[in-house]
Amino acid sequence: MALEAMNTPTSSFTRIETKEDLMNDAVFIEPWLKRKRSKRQRSHSPSSSSSSPPRSRPKSQNQDLTEEEYLALCLLMLAKDQPSQTRFHQQSQSLTPPPESKNLPYKCNVCEKAFPSYQALGGHKASHRIKPPTVISTTADDSTAPTISIVAGEKHPIAASGKIHECSICHKVFPTGQALGGHKRCHYEGNLGGGGGGGSKSISHSGSVSSTVSEERSHRGFIDLNLPALPELSLHHNPIVDEEILSPLTGKKPLLLTDHDQVIKKEDLSLKI
């Protein structure tokens, strides 16, 4: 369709007209370009000219300008368009209403922060509570009693009511009073360090008992040849000796004398007489 339209006589006629127009324009512009630059009078008030934007001149006056002046005028008009756009943008921003400030009735007395509800304020006040100081308690014997340490930056369990259950001996925090009571019982019984003199004495006593028991077990592991043999380990088993050892409070038993012993006894009696 486009090729057919171009081949029509009307299209060729319009093409010829455009060529003629271009020739006329070239003839008209050629003396205008070769002409010397005209000197025009400048206004004596530069402040008024700088403040007021350049006005568009009529068509006849624009034809008197040189090409350089016409381009400079176009650049000035383009430069004046940017502030107008920014001014319109600033006006649109100023027209937008500011965000409505929310009324927060609940205010913290410490840091002056406001909250919409009392529950939020209570949760915030929990962060202002004083944390227990850093405490490191050790005992004399590190092998028997453990070391208890509390770091200030550590999060301690706090009950829902907000009450802190802290041990007065080792400053350890517990969520409930029952847990604190069970922990204090360990201090009173001497199972944990830091419970006073009684706890340390009981720990030292238990350490000495354990050392004696370990010594007895070590002696049982081997036989000392310097010690006399035990009765149950003797080679010649004598039932009479065993009976005397087992029952030292038994009465006297009659001696069974042989004939030779009786003769010797009679001789001894005769000699005494």
Curated annotation (Swiss-Prot):
InterPro entries: AZF1/2/3-like (IPR044653), Znf_C2H2_sf (IPR036236), Znf_C2H2_type (IPR013087). It comes from the Eukaryota. Expressed in roots, radicles, cotyledons, hypocotyls, leaf veins, stems, sepals, petals, stamens, placenta, funiculi and maturated seeds. One of its GO terms (cellular component) is nucleus. Its main location: nucleus. A zinc finger (C2H2-type) spans 106-128, 165-187. Induction: By abscisic acid (ABA), ethylene, salt, cold, dehydration and the monovalent and divalent cations Li(+), Na(+), K(+), Cs(+), Ca(2+) and Mg(2+). One of its GO terms (molecular function) is zinc ion binding. Residues 34-43 have a biased composition (Basic residues). Residues 33-64, 195-215 are annotated as: Disordered. The keyword Disulfide bond does not apply. Keywords: Abscisic acid signaling pathway, DNA-binding, Jasmonic acid signaling pathway, Metal-binding, Nucleus, Repeat, Repressor, Transcription, Transcription regulation, Zinc, Zinc-finger. GO terms for biological process: abscisic acid-activated signaling pathway; embryo development ending in seed dormancy; hyperosmotic salinity response; negative regulation of DNA-templated transcription; response to abscisic acid; response to water deprivation. Residues 44-54, 201-213 have a biased composition (Low complexity). Plants overexpressing AZF2 have increased sensitivity to salt stress and barely survive under high salt conditions. This is Zinc finger protein AZF2. The lineage of its organism: Eukaryota, Viridiplantae, Streptophyta, Embryophyta, Tracheophyta.
